[in-house]
Amino acid sequence: MSILPGCKDPSLSALKSKGYNVVQLPRADLRPTQLLVEKSKRLQRLGELLSVFDAAADGPPAPPVSADRPGPNIAGTQSADLDVDLGLSVLRGIISALGGSTLGVDAAFARAATVQFEFSSTLENNSELALIDRFLAASRVNPHARAVAEMLEQDQVYVVTSTLKAQRINVAAKDSNKQSLGLNLPVIQDAIGANVKIAAAAASGSTVSFEGAVPLVFGFQAVRLIFEQGRYRTMRLVDAGGVVAEAVRPDGAADGEPPCYLDVEAMLLDR
């Protein structure tokens, strides 16, 4: 899981090696076949396929999403050590997404100088590219979706094709001397409430696992849709690797798609 744009984070290489891009702040409600739109060099959620495209009466249905299945074995998915202020900001977002309370979290990590995150027991969902391609070729843009039609004509719309998620996230803390810091599990559990389970993920007590009822998506794959005169023409695969939304070039260079990065801060505005 990568948090900092532009930092050398080992998790980026691990996810990139499996063809995935990084969700900066993991979330539960990102899934395959959702549409994203590039706006001001950021990707924001646009809607579902059937919110924009009308399926042909004699054409293929909307592509299904696979059931949960074990994700790829990703070694080195630990994030870089984050300054405690930034790390706790991320942790509060994760705990909230898992269904817990964030009151008292800062006090539980009062002695920490840095925080590190790691995913465990990953799950994967996907929708077949061939089925997405067939559906788009046969369907039509809803005539009432005028703004979306303009976005499609400008090749600003993406389809999520695969997601990688985890129900358990490990958090480690270090003190100002970069030594592993023991964490008080009862204090943390009292702070976040019963909706999120915690347990020691290391014998030293310096790593705590947070587990909620709903897995959080931390990696994704997507394709960029290419339209011409209101009709779907083709799609372009989005290269894996990176976290900075500003790295997405809006012109879609002919020498291959650049890395595409999901900017979660922008997506949070859609809530």
UniProtKB/Swiss-Prot annotation:
The chain crosses the membrane at residues 74-90, 102-120, 168-185, 194-210. The keyword Cell membrane applies. Keywords: Antiviral defense, Cell inner membrane, Cell membrane, Cytoplasm, Lipoprotein, Membrane, Palmitate, Transmembrane, Transmembrane beta strand. Disruption phenotype: When deleted from its operon, no longer protects E.coli against bacteriophages T4, T5 or T6. Palmitoylation helps stabilize the inactive state; may self palmitoylate. Palmitoylation plays a significant role in pore formation. GO terms for biological process: defense response to virus. The N-terminus has marked structural similarity to the mammalian gasdermin N-terminal domain. The C-terminal region wraps around the twisted beta sheet core, probably stabilizing the inactive state. Belongs to the bacterial gasdermin family. This is Gasdermin bGSDM.
